[in-house]
Amino acid sequence: MGEIIDLIRNAGVKISCLEEEGHFPFIISSNGLDKKEVSINTDTSSQYASALLMAAVMTGLKIKLTGKRVNGAYIKITLNMLKQFGIKYVQFEENKYNIEKQRFRLEKYQIEPDMSGACYFYAMSLMIKKKVLVKNLHLNSMQGDIKFLYALKKMGCLVKDTDEGIIID
């Protein structure tokens, strides 16, 4: 957490760590960002980059992603979600984004289930020999762990994508 806290502090946000420096719990107070351009390394976690992409909408920000995950699944999921919320952004090269200050414009949004967590239930279906359905999850998911279902398919499992969700039998 220390890296993202430092990045946000350097952009003009006040963060007071209540216990150990660089860790939860902390208090954030801000009147906006002093910087209009930031760079974040995705090697540690692409979640920080995703959070920054979402927060950029509130103030307007140019973001440069560095590291190995600049084009990873979670970055793609975040950008897709922003589009669904009506957010416009400009992508320069593979790793640079310009997001102007805007408003989110979607009143209802179906959050896709976490495929990492769903894998346990799908694996359990093999052990107990019962069908398992995870609602609102589909094979066109952008989540990287969806590949687990293709591995199950190769092992002979029936993987069926229905309107309701994915069933393993």
Regions found by a protein language model. Give the residues of each.
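Structural preference for solvent-exposed beta-strand-turn elements
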Residues: M1-D169
